[in-house]
Amino acid sequence: MWNLRITPLSFGAACQGIFTSTLLLSSLTVPLVCTIVYDSCLYMDINASRALANVYDLPDDFFPKIDDLVRDAKDALEPYWKSDSIKKHVLIATHFVDLIEDFWQTTQGMHEIAESLRAVIPPTTAPVPTGYLIQHEEAEEIPLGDLFKHQEERIVSFQPDYPITARIHAHLKAYAKINEESLDRARRLLWWHYNCLLWGEANVTNYISRLRTWLSTPEKYRGRDAPTIEAITRPIQVAQGGRKTSSGTRKPRGLEPRRRKVKTTVVYGRRRSKSRERRAPSPQRAGSPLPRSSSSHHRSPSPRK
């Protein structure tokens, strides 16, 4: 990092701008360190670890914007903050909420300063090509104290007498781009952790796997709509919603004594239960002959006698 002396010359303000831009690098490396060391330090299930790695491959428009993401994350974290929870996902999501808020403001400030410098850059100055600007992957390998020096050497190699205001503009644009890529990585991690609090880590893991499968399937072989986490986490409720429920309660089998089957027989064309006591036959039944009196048991005298 260069120690520039502030001079009253016409480009003194520009030198002050370069010095200020080097101070902003202290906030640049925070998400880089967090996102690099994050995967190796955090213990998690192997399936969850794979799903988290797949989060980085999801389309950019899948995730909410920074403002919406931070607001949704705060709503999900508020109950845990009130109870002073120390769950893994709560601690990490809280860290990324604070990090993204501060880091996003720093990045927006870099863009605003860079745009304001356009008015004082000579109109004939050619912009620094992208190949001369440090990229995000290179910034991860360069020490913090050497980042500004490496970028300045590249600008000088492009044009030794490059205007000072244009150099400041190139520095800010390079750092802002690195910031945005780091913010995107932190944004995906924040989305993962606060959704694990809302839906459960296993459900989010399952959702990411199904979504990745849907995205990798050719359009003509997959469904029209992408899978949603609501449908995955509530399959039972959805299936039972269309079933008609009976008004009464059904007793489970086996809790009431078995009813004994009653055997029946047919007597004179009528059904009678054997379990009932047999009653004496009535004097006269339908379809039966008249009962004989006791005297009828003796034979009547023969008329021949």
Curated annotation (Swiss-Prot):
Task: Enumerate the propeptide ranges.
Answer: 273-305
Q: Tell me the compartments it is located in.
A: Secreted
Q: Which Pfam families has this protein been placed in?
A: Hepatitis_core
The signal peptide, as residue positions, is 1-19
Q: Which residues form a coiled coil?
A: none
- What molecular function terms (GO) are annotated for this protein? structural molecule activity
Q: Which SUPFAM superfamilies match?
A: Hepatitis B viral capsid (hbcag) (SSF47852)
Q: Which GO terms describe its cellular component?
A: extracellular region
Is the Secreted keyword given for this protein?
yes
Where are the annotated segments for Disordered?
Answer: 226-305
Please name the Gene3D superfamilies in this protein's record. Viral capsid, core domain supefamily, Hepatitis B virus (1.10.4090.10)
Where is this chain compositionally biased, Basic residues type? 258-277, 295-305
What keywords would UniProt list here?
Host-virus interaction, Secreted, Signal, Viral immunoevasion
Which residues does the annotation list for site: Cleavage?
A: R272, S273
Q: Which family does it belong to?
A: Belongs to the avihepadnavirus precore antigen family.
Role of this protein: May regulate immune response to the intracellular capsid in acting as a T-cell tolerogen, by having an immunoregulatory effect which prevents destruction of infected cells by cytotoxic T-cells.
Q: How does it associate, per the subunit comment? A: Homodimerizes.
Protein's UniProt name: External core antigen
Q: Please give the organism.
A: Duck hepatitis B virus (strain China)
- Gene symbol here is C
